[in-house]
Regions:
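A short Gly-Trp-Pro
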Residues: 1-131
Length: 131
């Protein structure tokens, strides 16, 4: 199990090291959300993550019938997205331990920050890659 937490330590979680996908997202929403050039995200089944501390501090943002964010209600750190298909998107920056699956590609590089240069050899997609 990998450990993760919010910025203020009010919420902690454990997640199985069984991510099915991982990527670096350069879309304008992820850049605004993080204040960084991109956001590294791992996707995993909802049943693979367990909140181990601070469940009472969780805050849901968005439509529970669609995709929504789960944040710490104290520091507002984004802990994961929940999708209707049963998967979660976990920001790798909230993990304490390193996951086995590293990001496999960059997406939305068509709208990436102009000041940032991608220096690795991972595949780059202008938008969300299909299939």
């Amino acid at each position: 199990m990998l450990r993760g937490r919010c910025a203020c330590n009010a919420v902690a979680y454990e997640v199985a090291d069984e991510f099915v996908a991982a990527y670096n997202c350069h879309c304008s929403n992820c850049r605004a959300l993080t204040g960084a050039a991109f956001l590294s995200v791992g996707q995993i089944g909802r049943d693979k993550l367990r909140v181990s501390k601070g469940a009472e501090s969780l805050m849901m943002v968005g439509d529970p019938g669609a995709a929504y964010e789960v944040r710490c209600g104290e520091c507002f750190s984004l802990l994961h997205w929940a999708y209707p298909d049963g998967y979660l998107g976990v920001p790798y920056g909230t993990l304490i331990d390193a996951p086995a699956l590293k990001p496999l590609h960059h997406q939305f590089v068509g709208s990436k920050a102009r000041w940032y240069k991608i220096l690795d050899d991972l595949p780059q997609h202008d938008e969300y890659p299909c299939c």
